[in-house]
Every structure is written in C-alpha cells, then in structure tokens.
Design a protein with these regions (language model features):
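Generic structural detector for well-ordered beta-strands
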Residues: 7-11, 58, 84
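Beta-strand/loop substructures that line and gate deep hydrophobic ligand-binding cavities in soluble
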Residues: 75-125, 129
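Soluble, non-transmembrane catalytic domains of enzymes that act on hydrophobic metabolites at membranes
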Residues: 1-2, 7, 75-82, 141-146
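Short, highly charged C-terminal tails/helix-capping segments
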Residues: 125-146
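Hydrophobic pocket/interface hotspot
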Residues: 17-21, 27, 59, 70, ...
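Glycine-rich portal/gate segments that line the openings of hydrophobic small-molecule binding cavities
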Residues: 28-29, 38-76, 145-146
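Intrinsic-disorder/low-complexity, polar/charged segments enriched in Ser/Thr/Lys/Arg/Asp/Glu/Gln
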Residues: 2-7, 45, 54, 67, ...
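Hydrophobic ligand-binding cavity/cleft-lining segments
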Residues: 1-40, 146
Length: 146
C-alpha cells in the first residue's frame, strides 16, 4: 500500500533539508529528553522500544540532495519511506514530499490508511511552518534550543 503526503514548499534549500534527514542521530537529537530512553542511533539506523515493540529504521538509499529512502529494520511489519527533496522555483526553497510503502493487511489498511496520510500531511505542514519561523501546534519550542 503506497501513501503519498501532500507536497509542501519548505523555506530551506534542498541540501539543507537533505543533510538534516540523512543522519539518523539527528532524529534522536530532536526528541524531548524524556523520550530518548531506549532509543539508539548511528548514521545509518535508529532503533527504539515503543509500547513494548522493538522498532528499527535504516537508511537504504541516499541520492544527494534529492531523495533519502528508509526501510524497516526489525519492525512488526514491512515498510519503506522515501523523502523527496525537489528544487523549487526559488533556489532557497524545496518542494518536499513523503511517500510510504507499507505491507499492511486489509484490516490494517482500512483502519490506518487515512490516519497515515493525515500524519504525513501534518509532518509536511509542520516542516513548512518551522522553516518559516512558526512553531506548529503541540510542539514545544524549547526542544530546539539545545
């Protein structure tokens, strides 16, 4: 099942966004302190214990400044995620999109399909907002001051 987010114009150049998402340790650095326990990462992978499940994600492909692909690495189901960093009309902006390919059974597709799309769209909207200096609702700005 392939699910694509909407496209958003992020106020950062493609290379800036690419560099943020290429190193999995950056994801840990963005977590609040109380969520970092049980999370381990290096440049190519991240593993965490979430509600009793071991979940891992690894980088499978890096196309400099245009695409990064991730895949499950010990998750309860198979999935892949592709982040697309396309040049925009402005060299200091990026058209950003997330595409998820998840191996879900019929029931899980029915339950989660729309929720995954909504979550992906929210991530894109939040990234756009943050790139323009607006902190998305529910995000604590102090998380980014460290």
């Amino acid at each position: 099942m392939e699910i694509s987010s909407k496209k958003g114009i992020v106020s950062k150049a493609p290379y800036e966004l690419f560099m943020l998402f290429t190193d999995m340790r950056n994801f840990v650095a963005m977590l609040p302190e109380d969520k970092k326990e049980g999370v381990e990462a290096d440049y190519d992978w991240i593993h965490a214990q979430v509600q009793g499940f071991n979940i891992g994600v690894k980088v499978t492909e890096r196309v400099p400044y245009s695409k990064i692909c991730y895949a499950d690495d010990g998750a309860p189901f198979k999935f892949g995620v592709a982040l697309h960093f396309n040049p925009s009309f402005d060299p200091y902006k990026t058209e950003f999109q997330i595409v998820v390919d998840a191996d879900l059974n019929f029931m899980m597709k029915a339950i989660l399909g729309g929720k995954i799309k909504d979550a992906l769209d929210k991530v894109v909207d939040s990234l756009v907002d943050m790139s323009e200096g607006r902190m998305p609702e529910g995000i604590d700005p102090s998380m980014f001051g460290k």
